[in-house]
């Protein structure tokens, strides 16, 4: 039987997303999520050949138990024998990795070195790699690391450097790395297709908006700047992350309010963003649904700050492109694909650039539907394109390991 399928693993600190894909057609044979690791109610849910299912993994279960369940309970002998390689999503590759690579000892060491920049994600990725080696020994030489930071490695020095003592970059690697690169790469290819141009002639501003969010600007198919920084904390307002703040706020919280560094980190990473602004939830839908409700001013407050910050980044990146033609402003991710309200608020800030929203088109482009959302006489096109990070991981893995 032909080994033409790819098993995709996206290991988080307390969850594991998985899928089995055909890299040529994008046909999804299996997808699912194992979650609540190390808790009493660790569980797994899946969709196999169109049929949904779920199960308990047992109290305290984690990556090992989840992968064992996938291999023994979900993968039939026929499906298992069709898997030719395993693709791992890796959040941070530092400067070492500029593209996807077959995993060996040196790659593992590189992922370990980048733990300092992704302390929650990279250790989980390493567990996933170790468990994949154990459970699928016949595919040990066919594991591929696909890095979220790789797409952004084409940024010029003026974009990735911070105005800190230069030795902090040279000696410690402190610079902008970005994230969501796999999504930004996929959307770049889709904008090129929409524009009828080769990727290496495509210019775009891509807004990946989900619980985490980032904007990137692409010139001739290559990223030249992005909003996330050394870590995914910088940039846009996010679900629970603050995004850009005055760094001196950290000193103030420490010196004046007596907060510990752990408390400050917890505040900026887990208690800010939409959650902090609403004081209710990190879910953007709450802010949308209650935007006009005068009794819930927190909803309007949160969505206005969110969309204003987004518009600032889009406008700045339009300026950076200069004389280069902008093929599209693209929205993707859970919020980018489904929130017509966020798109409307953000694009209305860009009227100076001649951006003109078409209200009906904007409302139609939701729930998996793509399309142009600007008017025919708009100076620039804005489009909605559902992302497909799993397909990019599958295709990169197939190129290197099949």
UniProtKB/Swiss-Prot annotation:
GO aspect biological process, one term: acetate metabolic process
Annotated site residues (Transition state stabilizer) in this chain: 180, 241
Family: Belongs to the acetokinase family.
Pathway: Metabolic intermediate biosynthesis; acetyl-CoA biosynthesis; acetyl-CoA from acetate: step 1/2
Cofactor: Mg(2+); Mn(2+)
Any one cellular-component term (Gene Ontology): cytosol
Residues at which Mg(2+) binds: 10, 389
Stated role: Catalyzes the formation of acetyl phosphate from acetate and ATP. Can also catalyze the reverse reaction.
Residues the record lists as binding substrate: 89
Quaternary organization: Homodimer.
Keyword Heme: no
Catalysed reactions, as listed in the record: acetate + ATP = acetyl phosphate + ADP
Alphabetical list of InterPro entries matching this protein: Ac/propionate_kinase, Aliphatic_acid_kin_short-chain, Aliphatic_acid_kinase_CS, ATPase_NBD
Cited SUPFAM superfamilies: Actin-like ATPase domain
Primary location group: cytoplasm
Cofactor: record remark: Mg(2+). Can also accept Mn(2+).
Superkingdom: Bacteria
Pfam families assigned to the protein according to its UniProt record, in alphabetical order: Acetate_kinase
Alphabetical UniProt keywords: ATP-binding, Cytoplasm, Kinase, Magnesium, Metal-binding, Nucleotide-binding, Transferase
Protein name: Acetate kinase
Residues at which ATP binds: 17, 208-212, 283-285, 334-338
Cellular compartments annotated: Cytoplasm
Active-site residue numbers: 148
